[in-house]
Amino acid sequence: GNLSQAAAAQHAYRQAQDARQRMGMLVQSLSDSQVTDIVSVGIGGSDLGPRLVVDALDAIDSRFRVHFISNVDGAAAQRVLSALDPQRTAAIVISKTFTTQETLANAEAAKAWLQAALPGDGMTNHFIGVTAAPEKAEAFGCGRTFAFRDWVGGRYSLWSAVSLSCAVALGPDVFEAMLAGAREMDAHFVSTPLERNAPVLMALAQVFNVDGLHRPARTVAPYAHTLR
């Protein structure tokens, strides 16, 4: 019923707030450490959203460099890892189910690379999981895990713990400002009359182009190279 849905929503909200707080603590911990490089391992929505944000805001001064690994052929992981120092690197493995084969293959490579230089508990702050199945991430060897709900779709996952690499790269102030912008857009969609509602108008324009004008193709032309 509605009560159970409301309770579930409250639980999800508290979980998200807890994740944000823990993300902030990790960012501070990494900032106080010798880590300078972040390796983000994921595919699809677990890779594209964070990659977009880091690329788009690359002008922001940050002590951290973020490297993305999504290709499963092995060469990409080898190329990234061979140029880094494991003592100064933290790997973030992002997978909703923690069963995605492409992601786990690259995660295994990153884990073996880190373990060779950081035996025992040395990997706690260097091998981090972001997932809707935290028990699987822990079993895989992640020293820290950040959870999100399994109903969070890939195209929306940027607004969850999936954006951990963004929080590290951008710093807490810029990251919180980005989330505030998302909240403003949510509020606009919920409260603005339809005739002035930007997402609704964009959707209606697309429907008209396809069904009315029979033009199914759509061009997205970024005004800045970093938004490509």
Residue ranges and their predicted role:
Residues G49-V54, Q78-L81, E102-N106, A137-C142, ...:
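Short acidic, glycine/serine/threonine-rich loops at helix termini
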